[in-house]
């Protein structure tokens, strides 16, 4: 019995087999194409040390105890130091001669890392947050510790602001603190914790600071039990509004915040603000996070630039820091990152007018994009190889069909080979 098969169906099945073979080959040689990998800056280091550190926060309940900070010290250099390229930056400037005012409830000025750096500090810090901010800005090197501030040559003036038991700082208190900071001669004013509401007095204090050529740096948001809210005075265009990014450079915020006016909350820059190792009251190290911590890094970067170029105005310093930041993949319109990640070395290595100076630094590390990134050369090789394999599979199928049709005999003169 001879079975007759529809030639059209046979050809269709063969074409399907060829396509399946090609698809399988493509999947085998290019598994990475199905899931782009997020780019991660090579300079980032894990913040985890060999010991568990106390985490400090900008706020606490009035009936909660003070932060219990031990005397453990991390010997490794924190990830933030590598991420910001501070070793190279300190070859150009340490912030010597620049006064930075830190608005916080308390700062323990007696810790070894802040010895000789702090004016107006207290002997204790219930929250521990103010001491960590001062350390981010200007901690000096201490033997056995890998921690050093962004501007270890700068001086810190502590301006007590907010309730020492809770950390809450209303707009009126911040306004008074900014006024006191400007009166002390500070060129940089760091607002440690923002207010969730503005006020006419706060607007006036910010205007007075700009008139006195002092740069106000403040957190973009204020944390609450209901989630983050837009911070004040960060919504003022003359204030450098800073948001936190994590160890891979991506913004910590999950989405933009909207003001009552319908406008998006302002963000000018991002800086490290997640799992940051800092100085704690008593001399031990702590872990902290948030936009206030990120603002402290930017305040330190401003001090570095002011010390290197003392003739720059506060507005020019602000513009330089924003224009030299590692920009977001979405550009300046990114509602979470603003101008991008602060780059202290880039800000100092860029001469007025935008001409880069010849300063050796760390290799460029592109910001991570939420859409991922693909290694272009490797991808090109994989794609070309995959296409070649597909072509060979198709041609092989055609030759196979012709050979079977001829019974595998040699082609007669003039008979097509394919």
Where are the predicted features?
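Protease zymogen maturation seam
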Residues: 3-6, 39-97
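Loop/turn elements at helix/coil->beta-strand transitions in domains of secreted/extracellular proteins
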Residues: 96-100, 153-156, 183-189, 211-216, ...
């Amino acid at each position: 019995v001879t079975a007759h098969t529809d030639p059209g169906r046979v050809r269709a099945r063969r074409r399907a087999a060829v396509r399946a073979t090609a698809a399988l080959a493509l999947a085998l040689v290019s598994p990475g194409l199905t899931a782009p990998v997020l780019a991660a800056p090579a300079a980032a280091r894990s913040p985890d040390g060999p010991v568990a550190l106390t985490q400090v926060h900008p706020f606490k309940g009035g009936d909660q105890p003070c932060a219990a900070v031990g005397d453990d010290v991390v010997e490794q250099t924190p990830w933030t130091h590598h991420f910001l390229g501070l070793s190279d930056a300190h070859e150009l400037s340490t912030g010597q001669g620049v006064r930075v005012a830190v608005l916080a409830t308390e700062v323990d000025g007696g810790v070894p890392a802040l010895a000789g750096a702090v004016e107006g500090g207290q002997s204790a810090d219930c929250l521990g947050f103010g001491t960590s901010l001062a350390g981010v800005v200007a901690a000096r090197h201490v033997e056995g510790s890998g921690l050093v501030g962004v501007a270890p040559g700068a001086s810190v003036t502590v301006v007590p602001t907010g309730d020492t038991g809770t950390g809450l700082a209303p707009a009126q208190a911040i306004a008074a603190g900014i006024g006191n900071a400007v009166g002390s001669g500070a060129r940089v004013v760091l607002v440690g914790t923002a207010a969730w509401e503005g006020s006419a007095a706060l607007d006036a204090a910010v205007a007075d600071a700009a008139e006195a050529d002092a740069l106000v740096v403040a957190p973009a948001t204020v944390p609450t039990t209901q989630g983050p809210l837009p911070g004040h005075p960060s919504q003022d265009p003359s204030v450098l509004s800073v948001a936190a990014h994590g160890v891979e450079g991506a913004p910590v915020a999950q989405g933009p915040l909207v003001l009552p006016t319908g406008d998006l909350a302002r963000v000018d820059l991002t800086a490290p603000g997640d799992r940051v190792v800092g100085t704690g009251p008593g001399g031990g190290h702590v872990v902290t996070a948030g936009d206030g911590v990120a603002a402290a890094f930017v305040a330190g970067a401003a001090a570095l630039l002011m010390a290197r170029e003392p003739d720059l105005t506060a507005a020019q310093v602000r513009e330089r820091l924003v224009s030299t930041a590692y920009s977001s993949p979405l550009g300046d319109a990114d509602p979470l990152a603003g101008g991008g990640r602060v780059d202290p070395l880039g800000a100092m290595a860029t001469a007025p007018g935008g001409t880069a100076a010849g300063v050796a630094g760390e290799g460029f590390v592109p910001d991570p994009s939420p859409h991922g990134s693909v290694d272009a050369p490797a991808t090109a090789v994989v794609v070309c190889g995959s296409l070649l394999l597909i072509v060979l599979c198709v041609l092989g199928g055609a030759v196979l069909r012709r050979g079977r049709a001829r019974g595998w005999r040699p082609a007669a003169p003039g008979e097509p080979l394919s």
